Amino acid sequence: MDLIEYFERQKQRCERELRYSEAPGFQLFERTPQGQHDITEQHIQELREARDQYQRTIDYLKTQG
């Protein structure tokens, strides 16, 4: 597997996870000593940023030939 293929797979993984995370009713919680916190929006934002970074990396690798 080359680098482009690796990053394309990672991007696809993010996109799949985003589909589930953006579904109505989906919630993601984190337990801390202070209690339970809803981190759904933070999780979605991190997935979007990762997906975009993977795409930038793919584009860069393609230009480098």
Residue ranges: model-predicted function:
Residues 13, 19-64:
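Short, charge-rich amphipathic interface segments used for partner binding and complex assembly
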Residues 1-16:
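Short, charge/polar-rich alpha-helical segments
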